[in-house]
């Protein structure tokens, strides 16, 4: 999600994010009065009443995979929602109504913070959704994203556009007063009975959730999943017959994590062509055998082919134990 800063905010805690009026923030999660956001290469928590944000109708962060399927099965082809990934905390999944079922795709992110499903990359989820409204999200069938907002003539409705602690109109029409910051619970000392004023609003009971573990660095700057086929393979069962089930079925029988328990993966055979779009990636053709140098990350491995070293997506290859 994208949000626009309405006021300057100076971070006072290590887990907070500073910004200036007019900055465009990338919202990563909704945490009541505080939101986790990204600006440039920095991440942190920001006060909700300092920013202007509209949550589209297709954004359902807390919905599970099963709930998404129940919701979308009663909709037309192309209806979708974006939700928090159950298998990868901090990431998103997109669930789309197809002809016979609901398909789930993991929204990938590269090292620059761009979002993508296939090879096209976008600076925000909003831009990704806009692109697949006119370009098929399916590689085998024509499936375009839709959520009913086209018929309404606007891009979704605001859900609680301003929190109760947000700015209120002043005596001048159209003027806003800079809001006070409702500090996080960890920023306050406990108040005794004699310290509480009957007209004073208590601080919101907010404590930042657990942070996803930082992944091992690869080639000095690799921190997270980057790109490639984006089926949410670890987020539950997907019906047979989908365009990405070849990868899914293969990983069910040759999951790299399971193979690592038996022994380190040293060689892998390419199942599909992979085109390297970044300098540190390793491209290959279907059928080629890649020497695996590091398979500790479940999503991207380090390998060598034709005397070239680089990263490649683990679900594009079949591990070989030899």
From Swiss-Prot:
PTM sites of type Phosphoserine: 186, 230
Domain SH3: 1-56, 263-322
Gene3D superfamilies: SH2 domain, SH3 Domains
Residue positions, PTM Phosphothreonine: 254
Single GO cellular component term: cytosol
Protein task: Interacts with SLP-76 to regulate NF-AT activation. Binds to tyrosine-phosphorylated shc.
Protein name per its UniProtKB record: GRB2-related adaptor protein 2
Organism listed in the record: Mus musculus
GN (gene name): Grap2
